[in-house]
Amino acid sequence: MEDIKIIKADYLIDNIDKAFLHWEGPWGKHLTFDEFCETLLPYRVDIEPLSHWRDSLSPEFSPTIDWLSHIDEYAYSPYQACQAVNDILYKSTVYANQIFHKFRHPLIARNAKDWNCVQYVYGVQYVMRDLGVPVHIDYTPQYGVRGNRHYWNSVLHYTGHSYPFQGYNSGPERSLDPHNGTIKVFRRSYARNRRWISEIVKDEQSHFPIEPLVE
């Protein structure tokens, strides 16, 4: 069922208000409106059940990283904030298996024993979004030299560059292994990719004559 048929106005208003506070925060104030809509505003990561996750995640993580906003090196750098938060997540993981998490929040620790890169990516997306750190989800559907897909996150820096990282594991710029032969990278988006659609339409039209001959 579509969200528009079940979601309540109060839920959307609450989500928007909290997202705007993060946009005004130290790690989000550099974002354009479109970037804000893609990274901090969304109330979902995928098709998971609706919940007031901003309220339930904040007590779990905000006290842990409040000190970041008081240090110049971290205060206005999404890159440094991302590094620090992901280090906290990494250290809170039992390293022997990298699958059991101390965090008890259901959105980021449910069925942890079955986690793969997708669950790590979704978990860190929730945490970063709740803290106001602008992060995307990127993926490759197929490696060039092995039979696997892979998902990872990318933090959007104030310079405009995106730096990839693996949630609960590596810091920015240490996520992609060039030896895996990444062929093509896609980015999860909440808005329609009009440029991509126009390229497809243009490519399809190029296979047909503009003025078909009629016999």
Language model: regions and residue ranges:
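Hydrophobic/aromatic-rich core segments of domains that either
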Residues: 72-88, 97-107, 112-113, 118-203, ...
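N-terminal accessory/pre-domain segments preceding catalytic cores
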Residues: 1-83, 109, 130, 183-215
